[in-house]
Amino acid sequence: MSRFRIAGLARTGLAAAAALSLIAGAANAADQVTFLTSWYAQAEHGGFYQAKAAGIYEKAGLDVTIKMGGPQVNGMQLLLAGEADVMMGYDFQVLNSIAKGLPVITIAASFQKDLQGIMAHDHVKGLDDLKDKTILVATPGRTSWWPWLRRKYGYSDAQTQAYTFNLQPFFNDKNIVQQSYPSSEPFQALQKGLPVKFFLMADYGYPPYGTTMVTTTKLVAERPDVARRFVRASIEGWKSYLKGDPSPANALIKADNPKMSDEQIAFGIKRLNELEVADGGDAKTLGIGVMTEARWKATYDLMVQEGLLAADTDWKKGFTTQFVKDLKITSR
């Protein structure tokens, strides 16, 4: 055999090997997913950052990019435009989107409890003890939790003032209570040495889920395995973050949001565990991330009752349990 023939065969063999290598690489390539949060990085987003930092997404065959939300970020718009594959959502937002005919769907709930609550001075006994108080409510709250609180306890719009995310009015007046998240405003009060109480609305019957995973109906239809792996890995991330070593996620959180301190992150993790937002309720037995039709129906009923949603909205289009019903990943 001539040397030219041998060289030709060698080149052919190398080309074939290269082609096989490319095919194998393509087969093993991780699926890319862009996840958009609802705000700046914080402990309340820790499960997703943990799944990224600890390699849980990678083990699931996913290359996940986490993008922070913020006050000027329209998450739903970015999701529908294809700039994000999954976003951190909210039940009211999703049901309103369904009413508008938008192709979105909730695939899991990180938290069994929405994180919205009320911060009050330490003499206040509970959410039923606000009749003589001034209640600070931000604009979005007037079309979500405030109608529920107002009806449940007989409060009035005359009690409310605008919440501008400035805590000074609260600090200066013991007759003021205000909307709050468990690890944000109470932490700032703690830094001031001011004793406060925090009342989570979910513990008083407010029905929406918290920190949900929302995607498009197209992704669920065309890439269900990607959705399934993303949900499972994210839930494993939450279990690891809240019950294990959170330091991998915390490093990423601080890299994305340098204003977030170790102290505030630790305070946030402590409060999330104390309030059992991820592993309480149905999640105790059915697993973190679980959703039920009954809970979604309760949110739909609330919105319709308060005139926030048309009664003919097909609320069942707002969620699917196919990715969470059989996982049963508990914290125990």
Locate the predicted segments by residue:
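Sec/Tat signal peptide C-region and signal peptidase I cleavage site
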Residues: 23-29
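Cleavable N-terminal signal peptides
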Residues: 16-17, 27
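Bacterial N-terminal signal peptides that target proteins for export
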Residues: 2-15
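Secondary-structure end/capping motifs
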Residues: 221-308
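Extracytoplasmic/secreted envelope proteins and their assembly/folding machinery
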Residues: 45, 76, 91-94, 143-147, ...
